Curated annotation (Swiss-Prot):
One of its GO terms (molecular function) is tubulin binding. Residues 1-45, 165-192 are annotated as: Disordered. It comes from Rattus norvegicus. Residues 2-115 are annotated as: Mediates interaction with LIMK1. Belongs to the TPPP family. Regulator of microtubule dynamics that plays a key role in myelination by promoting elongation of the myelin sheath. Acts as a microtubule nucleation factor in oligodendrocytes: specifically localizes to the postsynaptic Golgi apparatus region, also named Golgi outpost, and promotes microtubule nucleation, an important step for elongation of the myelin sheath. Required for both uniform polarized growth of distal microtubules as well as directing the branching of proximal processes. Shows magnesium-dependent GTPase activity; the role of the GTPase activity is unclear. It is an enzyme of class 3 (hydrolase). It comes from the Eukaryota. Predominantly expressed in mature oligodendrocytes. Induction: Strongly up-regulated during the differentiation of primary oligodendrocyte cells. This is Tubulin polymerization-promoting protein. The modification Phosphoserine is found at residues 19, 31, 34, 106, 158-159. Keywords: Cell cycle, Cell division, Cytoplasm, Cytoskeleton, Glycoprotein, Golgi apparatus, Hydrolase, Magnesium, Metal-binding, Mitosis, Nucleus, Phosphoprotein, Zinc.
């Protein structure tokens, strides 16, 4: 016999579904997050003039360099271009010794912090008559705002062969007729024999004066 009692049904879920967030509140939240990110970016410390110079020399001649580390070659160039090397108190040898002393044993580069340590070492030798702090400041002044000096620019070199080929006063034959005394080209007149159809004998100095004489006689 079938059970006449009805099975209890599950209570319907009366919890209302989550409504989508208020667009105005979402926009406000995104705006606040954006402002916070901008404030964080603005709060990032600016590079000092010394660190800017360090980065300029660090990337010099190396397209893959990041500017955060400096090779020994660029370190020597910085000391030379910024006149840290004076040839008396500080020499190229001194610069190389300090670099080897500061960098790690297995490293070939130095960081900005190590760079500052190296400058402190050189400052003692470069400005012996000043206190340690004053000497460091003087060395920093030599470097701040500086950039690598570009050298090895090709210059024009004069040679007898080049002079002979370019000096128009030494040209002969038909080539000589293509230039005037100042070396300026005559254009078409120097390349083509133009026919004189004026009726005057070549070399006649009074060409074109006949009409003036006739009018003057009237």
């Amino acid at each position: 016999m079938a059970d006449s009692k009805a099975k209890p049904t599950k209570a319907a879920n009366k919890t209302p579904p989550k409504s989508p967030g208020d667009p105005a509140k979402a926009a406000k939240r995104l705006s606040l997050e954006s402002e916070g990110a901008n404030e964080g970016a603005a709060a990032a410390p600016e590079l000092s003039a010394l660190e800017e110079a360090f980065r300029r020399f660090a990337v010099h001649g190396d397209t893959r360099a990041t500017g955060k580390e400096m090779h020994g070659k660029n370190w020597s160039k910085l000391c030379k271009d910024c006149h840290v090397i004076d040839g008396k108190n500080v020499t190229v040898t001194d610069v190389d010794i300090v670099f080897s002393k500061i960098k790690g044993k297995s490293c070939r580069t130095i960081t900005f912090e190590q760079f500052q340590e190296a400058l402190e070492e050189l400052a003692k030798k470069r400005f012996k008559d000043k206190s340690s702090e004053e000497a460091v400041r003087e060395v920093h002044r030599l470097i701040e705002g500086r950039a690598p000096v570009i050298s090895g620019v090709t210059k024009a070199v004069s040679s007898p062969t080049v002079s002979r080929l370019t000096d128009t006063s030494k040209f002969t034959g038909s080539h000589k007729e293509r230039f005037d005394q100042s070396g300026k080209g005559k254009g078409k007149a120097g390349r083509v024999d133009l026919v004189d159809e004026s009726g005057y004998v070549p070399g006649y100095k009074h060409a074109g004066t006949y009409d003036q004489k006739v009018q003057g006689g009237k």
